[in-house]
Amino acid sequence: MEWGPGSDWSRGEAAGVDRGKAGLGLGGRPPPQPPREERAQQLLDAVEQRQRQLLDTIAACEEMLRQLGRRRPEPAGGGNVSAKPGAPPQPAVSARGGFPKDAGDGAAEP
């Protein structure tokens, strides 16, 4: 006996099920479903509701980004806080306590 899509097994005949009732409810009728137009409208309403939720989420994200943009971020280099405006920038001090070496001078670290 074959086991493919057209076999007796896939049609339910091997289990003793009448071909006319295979895959149907107890009474041999399919479960009641709303008409296609009603189901289509339900799906459309669900899609529109989800779209509104996503648009609300996007608007909230844009508002947060606007609020964050109003704040002035600190300088990326972590500049000297005590420096006065217009003063020359102070060199950064490395974690080892010394000034950073020029990467191109070839000098070895101590």
Swiss-Prot record:
Keywords on record: Coiled coil
Domain of life: Eukaryota
Record flagged with keyword Amino-acid biosynthesis: no
Stretch forming the signal peptide: none
InterPro entries named among the record's database cross-references: DUF4726 (IPR031714)
Keyword Ligase on entry: no
Coiled coil: 36-68
Region (Disordered): 1-42, 66-110
Disulfide bonds: none
PANTHER family: RGD1559909, RIKEN CDNA 1110065P20 GENE
Protein's recorded name: Uncharacterized protein C1orf122
